[in-house]
């Protein structure tokens, strides 16, 4: 077992759409992995601009399911390809009218370990 683990933390300015934020984040994940990070943490609500100060229903469209959502799906591919664990906080749609500020934990084999 290794005596230490390198952790990479990524903080970026947010774009207007979740897809744009994922596209912006993926190269930084690759960069962190290339520098030896085995665990990579993203900023809170990485797929959106931070809006949690208010409860505005117009933001509910930005939520996505953890297990099947497009953002986690793309990150899972990257985690598997790079052999890294990714902690990805995002706005989760967890059912009808149930939303959470959640972090998905994606293992180095691309599986979602939990949230």
Residue ranges and their predicted role:
Residues 4-16, 102, 114-115:
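Active-site-proximal beta-strand elements of phosphoester/diester hydrolases
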Residues 18-19, 27-112:
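Cys-nucleophile CN-hydrolase/nitrilase-fold catalytic domain and related Cys-dependent amidase chemistry
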């Amino acid at each position: 077992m290794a005596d230490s683990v390198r952790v990479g933390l990524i903080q970026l300015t947010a774009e207007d759409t979740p897809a744009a934020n994922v596209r912006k984040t993926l190269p930084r994940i690759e960069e962190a992995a290339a520098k030896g990070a085995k665990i990579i943490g993203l900023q809170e609500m990485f797929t959106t601009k931070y809006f949690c100060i208010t409860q505005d229903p117009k933001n509910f469209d930005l939520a996505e399911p953890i297990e099947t959502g497009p953002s986690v799906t793309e990150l899972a591919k990257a985690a598997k390809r790079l052999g890294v664990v990714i902690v990805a906080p995002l706005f989760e749609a967890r059912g009808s009218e149930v939303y959470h500020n959640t972090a998905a934990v994606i293992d180095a084999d691309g599986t979602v370990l939990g949230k």
